[in-house]
Amino acid sequence: MSELAGNGCQIIVPFDERKPLKEIEKSILKKYRKYTWSKFIKAIKDYKLVEEGDKIAVAISGGKDSLLMAKMFQELKKHGQVNFDLEFIAMDPGYHPDIRQLLIDNCEYLEIPIKLFDANIFEVADEIASDYPCYMCARMRRGALYNKAEELGCNKLALGHHFDDVIETTMLNLLCAGNFKTMLPKLNSTNFDGIQIIRPLYYIREESIIKFIQNSGIWPLNCACMVAAKKTGNKRYEIKNLIKSLGDNFQEVEKSIFRAAQNVYLDSVLGWEQDGKRHSFLDKFEVEDK
């Protein structure tokens, strides 16, 4: 299976055989409560991600993050106090047949009732942006998920981005795009009216998700991209390694990067953009001169 992964892809190998489903579900609320479930609930409460009457499309890629997210949503539905509905949607963007079957088998074992649909995104993204197809692929996949969520009458689309994805995005924008912009816990779609993206794994560290999956005995989809399997290099992996190396010299650097987006002092920046309009620190001087 590792032959299907890209050169920079992390291969997550289970510790043992698959554990019984009930044991896996119990571990979310017990063994991994502090590191996964509690942070899932905190993000939902802090950012009001799940509200009365919501119909949430939970995006299932088959990777470690989306599988855990799906199971936690099922537990929230079972034990929570808010009335909401769930749809589990899984897209095949051009997986190898073995990868597609692994996705189906895992979801059947975990009793995640996915609605699987096809989209030839990998091939199209590679043709449009062959040098670096990842960005184009992500946009196309997002659009396909939006379409499916809308088709099912959902008002929210849940994605499995976690804490490490958030800080890596912040650093990618800073170092590669020259801007300060992070990944938000929720945002309204600009192209699909009435649909909101939510990210309930916002506070959960990737290492906690990996430990949960390995202990469960589940072999998740690792890098299932048939395009990445032929490519070398990925800026996100470089940023991930950079943050790790910074952690050797700066205490809790990950938390500092995360908190930076909560503590932006507009009086001390040269410029910013809000609602599509550019602003400059010079604007206040022009007002004073009038």
How would you name each of these model-derived features?
Residues 218-290:
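The feature marks non-catalytic terminal segments
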Residues 116-122, 147, 187-192, 229-233, ...:
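Short C-terminal domain-edge/linker segments immediately following a structured domain
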Residues 85-86, 164-238, 242-245:
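Catalytic subdomain that performs nucleotidyl-dependent activation
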Residues 2-172, 176-179, 184, 207-215, ...:
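ATP-dependent adenylation/nucleotidyltransferase module used to activate substrates
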Residues 138-152, 186-192, 243-260:
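Short, basic, helix/turn surface patches
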Residues 30, 34, 97, 139, ...:
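Electropositive phosphate-/nucleotide-binding environments in soluble metabolic enzymes
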Residues 112-131, 191, 195, 268-271, ...:
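Mobile, glycine- and charge-enriched loop segments
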Residues 92-94, 120-122, 189, 203, ...:
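Short, solvent-exposed coil/turn elements at secondary-structure transition points
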